[in-house]
Amino acid sequence: MFKLHPQKKKTQTRNYTGPWRKTPGRLLGLLLIRFYQITLSSFIGNQCRHAPTCSEYIYEAIARHGLWAGAWMGLFRIMRCGPFGTHGFDPVPTSLGNSYYFYKPWCYWKISARHNK
């Protein structure tokens, strides 16, 4: 009479689960970040001063904005994560706007201060 449908088990992940285009560059970047999260991160330990952690931030930045912009955003995030750097909630921006060009990667440094105000 009643059919019980097995409920799908939600996968637990700490990484970005929203929609993103699966291009070769993004897949390569995300594969490298995931490799780091599974292997090296457990040896180093969680010492990030931000939420989301730096590896989660880079994963989401690459998924949302591509390998080039996401990698630069991630590099600058790691540079901000030192003992004299910033701390607290620092999300990846949903859009970069019109002032960010691939040939000016140093502009990605300003993203955090600009979108968190």
UniProtKB/Swiss-Prot annotation:
UniProt keyword terms in alphabetical order: Cell inner membrane, Cell membrane, Membrane
Subcellular location: Cell inner membrane
One GO cellular component term: plasma membrane
Membrane topology qualifier: Peripheral membrane protein
Highest taxon of source: Bacteria
SMART domains for the chain: Haemolytic
Disulfide bonds: none
Listed Pfam families: YidD (PF01809)
Function: Could be involved in insertion of integral membrane proteins into the membrane.
Family named by the database record: Belongs to the UPF0161 family.
Protein's UniProt name: Putative membrane protein insertion efficiency factor
Taxonomic source organism: Bartonella quintana (strain Toulouse) (Rochalimaea quintana)
